[in-house]
Amino acid sequence: GAVPVARALEWELGVDQLAVACLEEAAELRKAGITAPILILGYTQPEFAADVVDLGLTQTVFTPELARALSEAAGAAGKRAGIHLKVDTGMSRLGALAHEPESAAREIDALCALPHLRPEGIFTHFADADGDEGYTMLQFTRFLDVLAQLEEKYGRTFEIRHCAASAAVLKYPCTHLDMVR
């Protein structure tokens, strides 16, 4: 299960951060004594924002509603909520749409500007990294374009930029950036 794997990763291998799909998985790890930073990659309903803050989790954000809920929950707790912003570079699932880098950068900057949030990272996910190299590289370029717009227009940079999951870790070292998943 997840708990023995997380313990081995944290206590024996010393990984910097863990990532899970949902709040329930993160809560299970915290309950088991895992203290490493945990990033929730999936969506969390805004009504559970206080749980994210109370457990000291980092939440993926791609909607104003969730960003506002996290900001309010963190403010009420006297804390800052760690967030990673999701950029949709072609998966067509979640995130600021990168096919318009200026618009995506504006949307992301507005989310980051909310009080009581601590923007730690930004990421995308490749649709077919184990298949279509051309499309994977197009997605990577789109992601870099959004990052460039964020820095040039808003002076915003991120400590952690990531996009490489399993297939990209093996096939595309140039996509590793600051973290792999």
Where are these regions (language model features)?
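Active-site loop/helix belt of alpha/beta enzymes
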Residues: G1-L13, R68, E72-A73, K79-G82, ...
